[in-house]
């Protein structure tokens, strides 16, 4: 797996609010994710995990507060930080092949030496022999591999994942855990939402629990961290 192209920046959320009409999805969220940390977001459905990830990915704007990347002195403006986002619903095109999906997004993102990068990623995610297969014929786990390869096209310093293990069989979950472990070892900053304790969540060195849009727990300690992950949906 190719390591990040540059030292991975941390992420700082300062007093983040997100409203949809009169409903708060996030309220007064202040967090700092250190460079190279692997952080798990836990909580019930609707607790704000996906909204926080989408703000970090700059797909939505907060209603109040700020998002910054302090270790590189970059603001949260689009295009100023290489980050990859893997959504809960895999964002790939069913009627294209695995190779065509990656080639399309590589060109849209301005990737240099597109064919070499696509070849490398197909090999890294174990899909070289299925490069010419239509994605609609893939299992959930194989689709997830395409989505992760897409997120890694720009060699991101930050990887954001929304429930990446959902629907994966044990083999797919084991592959994903190994991939994320290699990225962590290479210095990539990872922020991911999880449901309960799993091989994926066990990679986390820090756990943050959200409830009704607020941070209610944040720990790196062993027993406390496992408690957050084990009872993520309680």
Question: What residue spans do the PLM features occupy?
Answer:
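The feature captures the beta-strand-to-loop junction immediately N-terminal to the Walker
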Residues: 42-44
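Helix-to-loop junction immediately C-terminal to a conserved catalytic motif
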Residues: 57
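H-loop/switch region of ABC-family ATPase nucleotide-binding domains
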Residues: 193-195
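Conserved catalytic motifs of ABC-family nucleotide-binding domains
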Residues: 155
């Amino acid at each position: 797996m190719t390591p990040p192209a540059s030292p991975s920046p941390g992420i700082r959320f300062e007093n983040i609010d997100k409203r949809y009409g009169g409903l708060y999805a996030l309220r007064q969220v202040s967090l700092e994710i250190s460079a190279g940390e692997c952080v798990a977001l836990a909580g019930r459905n609707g607790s704000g995990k996906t909204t926080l990830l989408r703000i970090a990915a700059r797909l939505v704007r907060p209603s109040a507060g700020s998002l910054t990347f302090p270790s590189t002195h970059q603001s949260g403006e689009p295009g100023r930080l290489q980050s990859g986002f893997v959504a809960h619903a895999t964002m790939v095109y069913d009627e294209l092949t695995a190779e065509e999906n990656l080639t399309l997004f590589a060109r849209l993102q301005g990737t240099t030496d597109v064919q070499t990068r696509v070849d490398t990623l197909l090999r890294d995610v174990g899909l070289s022999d299925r490069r010419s297969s239509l994605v609609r014929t893939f299992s959930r786990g194989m689709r997830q591999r395409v989505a992760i390869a897409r997120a890694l096209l720009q060699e991101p310093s930050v990887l954001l994942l929304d429930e990446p293990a959902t629907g994966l069989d044990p083999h797919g979950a084991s592959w994903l855990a190994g991939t994320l472990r290699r990225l962590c070892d290479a210095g990539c900053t990872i922020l991911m939402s999880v449901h309960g304790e799993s091989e994926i969540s066990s990679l986390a060195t820090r756990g943050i629990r959200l409830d009704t849009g607020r941070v209610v727990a944040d720990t790196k300690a062993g027993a406390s961290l496992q408690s957050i992950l084990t009872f993520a949906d309680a």
